[in-house]
Each structure stands twice: as C-alpha cells, then as structure tokens.
Swiss-Prot record:
Gene Ontology molecular function: any one: aminoacyl-tRNA deacylase activity
UniProt keyword Kinase present: no
Gene Ontology CC: cytoplasm
Family: Belongs to the class-II aminoacyl-tRNA synthetase family. Archaea-specific ThrRS editing domain subfamily.
Subcellular location: Cytoplasm
Protein name, entry field: Threonine--tRNA ligase editing subunit
Highest rank taxon of the organism: Archaea
Chief subcellular location: cytoplasm
Described purpose of this protein according to its UniProt entry: Freestanding tRNA editing subunit of threonine--tRNA ligase, the catalytic subunit is AC Q97VW8. Deacylates (edits) mischarged L-seryl-tRNA(Thr) in trans, removing L-serine, has no aminoacylation activity. In vitro when both subunits are present, or if the 2 subunits are fused, L-seryl-tRNA(Thr) is no longer produced. Has no activity on correctly acylated L-seryl-tRNA(Ser) or L-threonyl-tRNA(Thr). Editing is probably catalyzed by the 2'-OH of A76 of tRNA(Thr).
Gene3D superfamilies: Anticodon-binding domain, D-tyrosyl-tRNA(Tyr) deacylase
Length: 386
C-alpha cells in the first residue's frame, strides 16, 4: 500500500462517471472540507490485515502531528503499477474506513469512479508526506550460508589489506622474470595453460558467486574430472628414489607438523604482511595523550599502528591483541610516561623487552626491510574500526 498525505486547508470532490465496469456504489458523491488530511491511497497486490494495521498507525500518526479536523480516504491508482484487483481494493478501503471511524472523523471517496477534485495545501513541512507500507518479511538463513559459517571465516578489512599486500609483493617479485620474445598474433585457444586444483590445498570460496563459461578445445586431452576428484581424497603420491619408496603429500603428517609448531610458539604473520604491526594499550585514559604521541612518531616512520582506547580492562585489551595476532604490543602506564621508554611484548619470540621508540622502529624495519612501505589503511583508534 502507498499513501500520499496532503494536509489541505480546503478540499472538495465531485463524482463524474464510471472508471471501471463494476465500481462500488457511490454513497458519497461530493464533499467540501477544511483543515483535512487527504490520504491518496493505492492498494497493491498482497495487501492484507497486517498492512491495514500499519496503515492506520501511519494515518493516525500524521493526523495527530498536523492537527487536522478530519481524514479523507481517496482511492488513487497512480502511485503504483502493482495494483490489487478492484474487489480486493474495495474491501481493504472499506476496512480502513471502518477501523478509523472509532478514532477520527473519516470520509471515503468511492472506488471506480472518475472524480473532479480541488485541493489547497497548507505548505508547512509536514503538509506533504508519503508512506510505502509493506508486510513484515521473515528472512531465512540459506543452507549454503550455514556451511560457510561452519567451514569458512568472515572477510574483513584486514583480509582485504593482506590480499592486496601479498599480490603487490608477488607482482614486484616476479616481474623481472617475464620477457616478451615474440609479438606475433596468436589466436585464443592456441596457446593456453590448463591446470587442476584437485590437490593444491589453497583456500577456495565456499559459494561461487561468479560462475564462468570455459571453452575447452577437444582432441588435446581427455579430462576425467569426476573420477579424479572423487578419488583424490584417497590418493598418496609415491616417489621412487634409489629403489626405496618415500611417501609424501600425506595430509595427516602435514596436520601433525602444523599442530606441533603451534604448541611450540604462538601463530604469527610476517611483520610486513600484518595489517597492524604495533598496538598501544593505555592502562587508563590519563595515558592516552602519551599513547597518541608515540603512535604519531611510529606512523611517520611508516609503521602500521593503532591504539586500543576502549573503556575496558587491561587484561581484555591484551587478549584482544593476542586474538588479532599483533606482532608488537605495548602497554602504556606511569613508568613508560616517566622514563619515555616502551615495554614491548614481541609475539614471534614470546618475549618482553624494554625499548625506545627509535629502537622499536629499527627492529620492525630490519624485519620487513624493503616490504615496509605498504598503505596505511587504518585509523589511529581501535574503536573507530569496529
């Protein structure tokens, strides 16, 4: 349902002739009113009792705000192309009138007739309003999304940063390896590289939102994808070296080594790839200004830094930094402000060290070397990123 509200100082209409074969009976053929709220109303397909309830609430809301003396329900089919059939529209308009009768003085123009009308609008800020009234829709979570939540992980600004950083680094790394030897015209399909991702182990999207059409030129190789994919989970590749069998590409061993490495030290990302290289944790708000000064010095050196200035306990701030895999975590307290030195927790070595700002900058730059000049995508304060 769509309603156009006009708060009119003067409004009148006169019924002229039939607009459809079977209009409703024209009980009210003419009217003249002052200070009335005219509701030009279009009934759409699917409108029901829920729509009526919302429409009444909207009409009464506008009526009370503009302080009109009466309400006019005026059928108006020109606000939508998705019109309900005449019988349904008449029933809904009648119900709308009957439900409003007990609350306000209401008049309803007949449906299915051509009418001449005259209107004079007050022109104040609330004198012209429109409302589109829809049914409440219950949203269901798709089965595909359930699998994505179970096996996938949410994309974030951090992942976008890491993807761009990695692509940029690899492009610079491999660019010198490519040379153009022959610029002769080669048609599509005559020179191509075919490969399979059956055992690549790379992370693939859970839902392919952009399926592609691939043209394969026949007669080159018979591809047995269904058979190979189904059998890949049971495949063990065997390499023969000096007449002895060596088993490689065994998933269980890979997982074992990963788990063992996790037990030895916390998981880390290379410093050059980490979206945030340094996080400052002020113990309380009194140390926020000093934290900002330190952060600005680090930013000027190209270090990606932010401040966890949330009104929270220090323990929670340290846990958040650990969850985010921050390489260098610095707690800012009274000692740091007085001595102008930093107590830095280094994640990769699981150690705590006292440093000056200059020493911290040197350590990070020595680690990332030429890969340090990546874009600074992040604002200074952590709460502005959430």
């Amino acid at each position: 349902m769509i309603i156009l509200f006009i708060h009119a100082s003067d409004f009148s209409f006169n019924v002229k002739e039939r607009a459809i074969k079977e209009p409703e009976e024209a009980k009210l053929k003419s009217i003249e009113l002052k200070n009335t709220l005219v509701c030009f109303t279009t009934v759409e397909k699917g409108d029901d009792e829920e729509i009526l309830s919302k429409a009444i609430d909207d009409i009464l809301d506008v009526y009370s705000k503009v302080k009109a003396d009466s309400v006019v329900i005026y059928p108006y089919a020109h606000l939508s192309s998705n019109l309900a059939n005449p019988d349904t529209a008449i029933k809904i308009l009648e119900s709308l009138e009957n439900l409003l009768k007990d609350k306000v003085k209401v008049y309803r123009a007949p449906f299915g007739w051509y009418k001449a009308f005259s209107i004079s609008c007050y022109g104040h800020p609330l004198s012209e309003l429109s409302r589109r009234i829809r049914k409440t829709e219950e949203l269901e979570k798709s089965e595909e999304l359930k699998y994505c939540e179970k096996f996938g992980f949410p994309s974030s600004s951090e992942s976008a940063f890491m993807r761009r950083a990695t692509i940029g680094y690899l492009r610079n790394l491999f660019q010198p390896l490519f040379e153009s030897e022959n610029n002769e015209n080669v048609r599509d399909g005559e020179m191509s590289i075919l490969y399979q991702n059956v055992e690549s182990g790379r992370i693939l999207p859970c839902i392919n939102e952009n399926p592609r059409i691939v043209v394969v030129y026949g007669g080159v190789r018979e591809l047995n994808f269904p058979k190979e994919i189904n059998d890949s989970k049971n495949r063990i590749r065997v390499w023969w070296v000096n007449e002895s069998k060596i088993y490689v590409d065994v998933g269980r061993l890979i997982y074992y080594f990963i788990l063992e490495s996790v037990k030895q030290q916390p998981p880390t990302l290379p410093d050059w790839l980490n979206p945030i290289q340094v996080r400052l944790l002020p113990v309380k708000k009194d140390f926020l200004d000093f934290s900002i000064q330190v952060a600005e010095r680090l930013r000027k050196e190209g270090i990606r830094v932010n401040i966890d200035d949330l009104d929270d306990s220090l323990g929670n701030k340290i846990r958040r930094a650990g969850t985010d895999w921050i390489p260098f975590v610095i707690v800012i307290g009274e000692r740091e402000v007085k001595t102008n030195t930093l107590t830095v927790k280094i994640r990769a070595r699981n150690e705590q060290k006292s440093m000056t700002v200059e020493e911290l900058v040197k350590e990070i730059k020595d680690e990332v070397k030429e890969r340090q000049n990546l874009p600074l995508y992040y604002t200074l304060y952590r709460h502005k990123n959430n």
